[in-house]
Amino acid sequence: MAFPWRRRNKPGTLRAAESDDARYLSEWVSTRRGIEGFVEPRTAVTDTTMLLVAVDGEWTRRRVPSVEWAHNFANKNGIPSYDAAVVGYPDRMREWNKRQKEL
């Protein structure tokens, strides 16, 4: 049985990182403290992304143009950056997610 609302033979396209994403990341960095950056490599379904985690575990993720761009962004903003595939994610992020679910 075919589902008429499903598209066939039309591959999806990834949305590129935009200046809005860069602006959002800059604003986020300026309004939080103790931030670390985690650069996530491109996958089959997502472009390269940057995950920012604040000292309290609050986090945000946005697409970025490249791995190099993400590390340069972190350096310019004085925050450490790591390759997420190598170091993983901080426990405080998981703890923050858990606290948010309990609210």
Task: Please give the residue ranges for each predicted region.
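Intrinsic disorder
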Residues: M1-L103
